[in-house]
């Protein structure tokens, strides 16, 4: 078992003597770590036997251990719950991806899953681990424009109440300075907002992995609501409106999450005003060019022998289309 002095030195390594707030956090980390040494030993034992993450805390990212002592992920989470979430995430992750891929995700720069070939639409989607985003999840899907982040999801894999591997999204965040860029991109994406576009990519990611259940954090469940006194540091983003607009529904088995459909249904002729049909047709044709290489890039990361049945088949994923293909289905007569 690690000594008390080990945890004191660790607390100073993570926080350092930078200011009063950091000193306070160092003391809190130390006190909580020492009083929960058995849980920390469980954490260390798990990662010592997890090949792609061996030495991660000592050699690469000691700050990641802060997940143990701070109320992250969701409202009022306990250290036991956060440790279980960590173990579940990495256990599930290893069923999907090879050890080399996991090592690159957490020790390296991650993977580009799609880059636009259109110079007038310089977008890139990347799957990465950003230690600064560990408060809401253990992996991120980023959307970049000209190398600058526009939106990103922070998420983790976990078992739902039925014991099924699922995705839990802890936040969606946008650039504070990306409003003007968002307007430009929405036009270039034929009316598709970048926020909705990255959600679409996330849904395709889930489908490709064969995951059937996708959960999204609610306003009430966001981790910052664990703290009674936060002043103007409280979360100002309204998640619920966006999720509900995308078809999310409450789930009696999930206290802090909505269940979100894993599919985004294409609108049909009867659901689109006649003057906007050409816009939607162009948008769907664009998605038809984006999704197949995006799926191929995801599958290239799979562990050998992992060949899941997609949990849904998006229309853009179908590459064998007839010559008279219309991205908007003909109206029912």
Residue ranges and their predicted role:
Residues 195, 249-262, 290-302:
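Hydrophobic transmembrane alpha-helix bundles
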Residues 1-184, 279-333:
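Non-catalytic substrate-recognition and accessory regions of acyl/acetyltransferase enzymes
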């Amino acid at each position: 078992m690690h000594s008390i002095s080990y945890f004191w030195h660790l607390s100073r390594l993570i926080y350092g003597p930078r200011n009063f707030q950091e000193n306070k956090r160092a003391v809190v980390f130390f006190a909580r770590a020492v009083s929960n040494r058995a849980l920390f030993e469980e954490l260390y034992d798990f990662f010592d036997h997890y090949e792609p993450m061996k030495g991660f805390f000592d050699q690469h990212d000691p700050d990641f251990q802060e997940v143990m002592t701070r109320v992250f992920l969701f409202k009022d989470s306990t250290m036991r719950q956060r440790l279980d979430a960590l173990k579940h995430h990495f256990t599930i992750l290893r069923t999907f991806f090879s050890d080399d891929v996991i090592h690159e995700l957490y020790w390296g720069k991650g993977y580009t899953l799609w880059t636009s070939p259109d110079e007038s639409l310089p977008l890139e989607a990347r799957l990465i681990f950003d230690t600064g985003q560990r408060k809401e999840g253990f992996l991120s899907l980023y959307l970049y424009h000209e190398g600058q982040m526009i939106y990103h999801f922070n998420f983790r894999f976990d078992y739902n109440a039925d014991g099924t591997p699922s995705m839990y999204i802890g936040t969606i965040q946008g650039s504070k300075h990306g409003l003007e860029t968002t307007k430009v991109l929405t036009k270039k994406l034929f009316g598709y907002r970048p926020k909705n576009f990255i959600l679409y990519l996330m849904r395709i990611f889930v489908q490709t992995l064969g995951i059937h259940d996708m959960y999204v954090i609610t306003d009430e469940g966001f981790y910052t609501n664990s703290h009674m006194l936060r002043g103007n540091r409280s979360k100002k983003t309204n998640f619920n409106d966006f999720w509900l607009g995308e078809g999310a529904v409450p789930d009696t088995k999930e206290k802090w999450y909505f269940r979100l459909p894993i599919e985004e249904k294409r609108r049909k002729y009867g659901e689109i005003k006649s003057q906007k049909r050409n816009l939607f047709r162009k948008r769907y044709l664009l998605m038809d060019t984006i999704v197949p290489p995006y799926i191929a890039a995801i599958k290239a990361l799979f562990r050998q022998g992992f060949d899941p049945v997609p949990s849904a088949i998006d229309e853009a994923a179908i590459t064998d289309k007839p010559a008279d293909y219309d991205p908007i289905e003909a109206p029912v007569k």
